[in-house]
């Protein structure tokens, strides 16, 4: 996984089942409330962009 989180200028590369994250070139850490919110926001934006891509490709209008 690679998720760029613009407000933090950081990239999430792994997430554990207990909620810890690993940012690129860093060790595992438990994100603060602000960091969690920033990660969730970035993920929601990425999901929306991927959904739009899927809709375009599935419509066959490429």
Task: State what each model feature region is.
Residues 1-2, 58-62:
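Short intrinsically disordered terminal tails
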Residues 1-38:
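N-terminal acidic leader/helix
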Residues 37-54, 58:
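Alpha-helical coiled-coil heptad-repeat register
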């Amino acid at each position: 996984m690679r998720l760029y989180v613009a407000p933090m200028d950081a990239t999430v590369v792994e997430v554990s089942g207990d909620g810890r994250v690993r940012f690129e070139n860093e060790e595992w850490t438990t994100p603060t409330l602000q960091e969690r919110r920033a990660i969730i926001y970035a993920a929601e934006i990425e999901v929306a962009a991927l959904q739009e891509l899927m809709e375009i490709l599935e419509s066959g209008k490429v």
